Amino acid sequence: MSRNLKGVLVVLAVVGLASEQRAHADTESKFAELRDKSDRFEGSFAAFLDRFVGECNDPLEASTCKQASAEFRKKVKGKKFYFIIGEDQVSNLSAGSYNPSRNEFTVNLTPFFPAGGYALTQGAPKKTDANGNPVFPFLPIKVKLPPDFSPQRFARTIGNKEVRMQLVFTPQDTWAIAKRGGGKLEGVRAQLEGVVLSLASSGDTLGAYYGR
């Protein structure tokens, strides 16, 4: 190989790496802006859903509970909120396809975020699957494979719950759908503003979804 050609290849490699770093920086800065403009809830994600839904099963406290939930919904509707979903709680990701020419992996995000018996969703569910779970279309997230990761290793990373999630959403209303065998499933209908995935082991950003 000629010295000139080697020089060209080195330049191309550096340009490619710089482009990838810029893409990650853009992803992080765009999400950081959303995050920094969001409200914080003093409590867990599960506690937020519980207060918003306000199922109020205790008959002795039902009236007070429902009033408190109604006031909470009025207070937070239309505001953006930020939460971190730990890797042990992330259950709505699945491995999609791999594009070898771009070294790009598609992670399928189901916009169903369960916690504490309820779930936050993008829109309200219309039906359930054979297992009684609400059905939603995937939201694809394009991920550049991290260094030293094969497609197989990355798929295992998804399956082994080694991915952390940051979430910004705007709560809109409650929803309920009949549950197989009786009863109902309930949750919070929301607009997903942004979702960022990162490796739990290093914190490195993998990719992001933006709703608007």
Q: How would you describe each model-predicted region?
A:
Residues 1, 16-17:
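Coiled-coil-like amphipathic alpha-helices with heptad-repeat character
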Residues 1-9:
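Bacterial N-terminal signal peptides that target proteins for export
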Residues 9-16:
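Bacterial N-terminal signal peptides
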Residues 19-25:
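Sec/Tat signal peptide C-region and signal peptidase I cleavage site
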Residues 27-85:
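N-terminal Sec/ER secretory leader and immediately downstream segment
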Residues 85-212:
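Mature extracytoplasmic/lumenal regions of exported proteins
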